[in-house]
């Protein structure tokens, strides 16, 4: 947050517009590769696409005045202006490469701080609208696909253990969302009393252990419960190849199973990256943009089923 300015939820429209202008000016001078776009200037379909890509939040889209966003062309860093706080700087990286994600965000933060004065307390650190973010103001989050643990009935125990270690466990859409497709977002709960490097090391270490447990669960599925695994894959592939209507949630559940099969080498003509692409492309905004037309919910369900059936038509199981 900027020093001397009201937090967004307490600010007037004029206050938020002033903050947006200050951030736009700072970006133009220190990070010209990122161009600021006001929320009011983003079309409805593009809003859906940005949300589905996890670049902006639904809360930001509710800002009729003073909301803004800027994203790098390669998608490694994104800035939200006047969401819950004046600035939300996000860094993204694939895999468990938390250091790169942190570096992208930290480098931009350092450049912006040359032009902006942040609200900071010697006793508390960075001041934020939500007390749970006070201190470093850092959330280090990892997306994990844990279908193997789910099929073995062990996911609840893992989630409980993570929460006891003061980690937040949410669905793919973040706070308040369900873990559709057994994709979980795990992040630090504490931001006060520990520095940024310590947060990143801790989240990385614990998530690496969860990944190890998921790999172990997949091995045990093959060795001890192969019928459970094969049935899950066969049912999902059959529905995706033959369904005439598919909601977003249904498609994600079935694609989750194919992602597991691809990762375990049990599907022909299918890689994990292919499934990740399909998971994004079957979302409402991406689907409509890809097909070049706006559709009703029922029309999207029909076109989603047709789109996915064509994409997985040649996929077969090796088991």
Question: For the regions a protein language model found, what residue spans apply to each?
Answer:
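Long, Pro/Ser/Thr-rich low-complexity/intrinsically disordered regulatory tracts in eukaryotic proteins
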Residues: 1-123, 138, 150-152, 157-319
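Conserved phosphate/anionic-ligand binding catalytic regions in large, soluble enzymes, centered on
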Residues: 125-144
């Amino acid at each position: 947050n900027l020093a001397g300015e009201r937090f967004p939820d307490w600010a007037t429209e004029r206050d938020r517009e002033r903050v947006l202008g200050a951030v736009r000016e700072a970006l133009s001078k220190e990070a010209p590769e990122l161009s600021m776009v006001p929320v009011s200037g983003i079309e409805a379909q593009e809003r859906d696409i940005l949300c589905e890509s996890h670049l902006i939040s639904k809360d930001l889209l509710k800002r009729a005045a003073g909301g803004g966003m800027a994203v790098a062309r390669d998608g490694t860093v994104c800035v939200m202006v006047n969401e819950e706080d004046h600035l939300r700087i996000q860094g993204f990286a694939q895999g468990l490469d938390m250091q790169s994600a942190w570096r992208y965000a930290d480098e931009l933060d350092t450049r912006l701080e040359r032009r902006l004065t942040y609200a900071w307390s010697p006793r508390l650190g960075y001041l934020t609208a939500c007390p749970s973010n006070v201190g470093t103001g850092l959330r280090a989050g990892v997306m994990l696909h844990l279908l193997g643990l789910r099929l073995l009935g062990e996911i609840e125990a893992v989630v409980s253990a993570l929460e006891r270690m003061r980690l937040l466990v949410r669905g793919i859409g973040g706070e308040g969302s369900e873990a559709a497709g057994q994709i979980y977002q795990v992040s630090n709960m504490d931001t006060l009393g520990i520095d940024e490097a310590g947060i990143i090391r801790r989240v990385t270490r614990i998530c690496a252990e969860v990944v190890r447990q998921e790999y172990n669960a997949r091995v045990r599925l093959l060795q001890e419960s192969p019928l459970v695994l094969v049935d899950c894959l066969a049912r999902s592939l059959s529905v995706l190849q033959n369904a005439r209507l598919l909601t977003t949630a249904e498609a994600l559940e079935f694609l989750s199973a194919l992602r597991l099969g691809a990762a375990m080498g049990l599907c022909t003509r299918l890689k994990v990256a292919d499934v990740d692409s399909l998971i994004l492309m079957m979302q409402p905004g991406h689907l409509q943009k890809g097909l070049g037309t706006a559709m009703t919910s029922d029309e999207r369900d029909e076109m989603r089923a047709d789109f996915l059936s064509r994409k997985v038509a040649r996929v077969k199981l090796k088991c």
